């Protein structure tokens, strides 16, 4: 009897496990709630040992019913579940309940769902940003097209107007370049040589363009100052480009109060420096009122107009004051500093407060007056010698 009972329990457990496994598979695939298991009420009497022999009829009836139940797994399942109701809640079934499976699935799906939501949100933000950028670019393109269409003139009139604007710009540029070039040439030549001009084309008769300036390789600035040093002293004056050595033999006749001093020949150089600094001066002036570099006697090649109207060139003497303290006097008139003054035959020069006078003459000049003065001086000297004897 006990062996049959244990056998029935084992078979019912097997069926219960297979039924639970089947129910679990159905839950995972179809996600349906399992059929409710019929539990016996807690007040139901527990399984009692088999009745005595007096109730053998009813026991036999029950045994036949149990046999019938073994054929139908559903009834056996309810019996076995009822029999197992005594066990703790955690040991009722070894297979997980549907709610537990659902919780596990939700935990597994949660990170995937969060990742998908995040990706979807990022994609939507990127699409929104892209759409906004494309809309901004489209607005900019429309504005640019509108601006270009506003600036773009009508085809025929636009071409004419563009050509006129270009022509006017070229003319203005050429005119400005010509003015700058002319101004630069005037500054360099210091108004020495007249510049030849070339008339512009027939369209611009009122504007003239000077001859193209040739490059100048002469020293200037600090280099010129370094090269303009003589015997360790920096010379204040630099000769102009038109400086020339004269062919005519000019001379300076100095006088001190009526006394004739030795003649100075000044035709061997293009310039002569006059001053108190004997180390660098070509013509020293020892009077204390004179500056170390007082003035310069300069020969320049300049243009002049002949009697027949033609233009010629000639070397003429000039005097320039180097900004001396007490000035330079030409025919008893003080001249302006840093400015050339043309000298002529028989002009008289004085420097500072010195009493010496310098008369400018050349080899062809009439020196009869000077000879007469020299003769008078010699006669006076002879008379003085005879009186003393």
Swiss-Prot record:
Domain FHA: 272-335
Any GO CC annotation of this UniProt entry: cytosol
Coiled coil: 166-197
Basic and acidic residues bias: start-end ranges: 1-10, 28-43, 103-138, 147-163, 363-373
Localization terms from the record: Nucleus
Feature: compositional bias, Low complexity: 54-72
Main subcellular location: nucleus
Nucleus found in the keyword field: yes
Pfam families: FHA
Any single GO BP term: miRNA processing
Cross-link Glycyl lysine isopeptide (Lys-Gly) (interchain with G-Cter in SUMO2): where in chain: 28, 104, 214
Cross-link (Glycyl lysine isopeptide (Lys-Gly) (interchain with G-Cter in SUMO)): 28
Keywords of the record: Coiled coil, Isopeptide bond, mRNA processing, mRNA splicing, Nucleus, Phosphoprotein, RNA-mediated gene silencing, Spliceosome, Ubl conjugation
A molecular-function term among this protein's GO annotations: mRNA binding
Record-linked PROSITE patterns: FHA_DOMAIN
Phosphoserine: residues bearing it: 18, 33, 48, 95, 149, 386
Record-linked PANTHER family: NUCLEAR INHIBITOR OF PROTEIN PHOSPHATASE-1
Name listed for the protein in its UniProt record: Smad nuclear interacting protein 1
Encoding gene, per UniProt annotation: Snip1
């Amino acid at each position: 009897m006990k062996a049959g009972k244990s056998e029935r329990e084992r078979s019912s457990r097997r069926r219960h496990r297979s039924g639970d496994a089947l129910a679990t598979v159905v839950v995972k695939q179809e996600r349906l709630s399992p059929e409710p298991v019929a539990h016996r009420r807690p007040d139901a009497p527990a399984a009692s040992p088999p009745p005595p022999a007096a109730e053998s009829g009813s026991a036999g009836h029950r045994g036949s019913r149990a046999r019938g139940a073994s054929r139908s797994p559903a009834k056996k399942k309810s019996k076995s579940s009822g029999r197992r109701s005594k066990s703790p809640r955690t040991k009722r079934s070894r297979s997980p309940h549907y709610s537990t499976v659902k919780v596990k699935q939700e935990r597994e799906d949660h990170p995937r769902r969060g990742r998908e939501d995040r990706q979807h949100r990022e994609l939507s933000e990127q699409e929104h940003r892209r759409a906004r950028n494309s809309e901004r670019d489209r607005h900019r393109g429309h504005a640019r097209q509108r601006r270009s269409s506003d600036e773009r003139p009508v085809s025929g009139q636009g071409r004419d107007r563009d050509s006129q604007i270009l022509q006017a710009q070229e003319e203005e540029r050429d005119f400005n370049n010509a003015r700058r070039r002319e101004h630069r040439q005037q500054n360099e030549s210091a108004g020495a040589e007249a510049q030849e001009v070339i008339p512009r084309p027939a369209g611009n008769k009122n504007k003239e363009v000077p001859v193209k300036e040739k490059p100048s390789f002469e020293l200037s600035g600090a280099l010129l100052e370094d090269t303009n040093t003589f015997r360790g002293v920096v010379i204040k004056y630099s000769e102009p480009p038109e400086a020339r050595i004269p062919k005519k033999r000019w001379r300076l006749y100095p006088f001190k109060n009526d006394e004739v001093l030795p003649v100075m020949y000044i035709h061997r150089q293009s310039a002569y420096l006059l001053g108190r600094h004997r180390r660098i001066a070509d013509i020293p002036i020892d009077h204390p009122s004179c500056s170390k570099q007082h003035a310069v006697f300069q020969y320049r090649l300049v243009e002049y107009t002949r009697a027949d109207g033609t233009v010629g060139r000639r070397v003429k003497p000039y005097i320039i004051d180097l900004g001396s303290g007490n000035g330079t006097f030409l025919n008893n008139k003080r001249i302006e500093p840093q400015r050339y003054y043309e000298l002529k035959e028989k002009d008289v020069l004085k420097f500072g407060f010195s009493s010496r006078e310098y008369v400018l003459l050349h080899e062809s000049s009439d020196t009869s007056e000077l000879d007469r003065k020299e003769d008078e001086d010699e006669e006076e000297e002879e008379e003085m010698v005879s009186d003393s004897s």
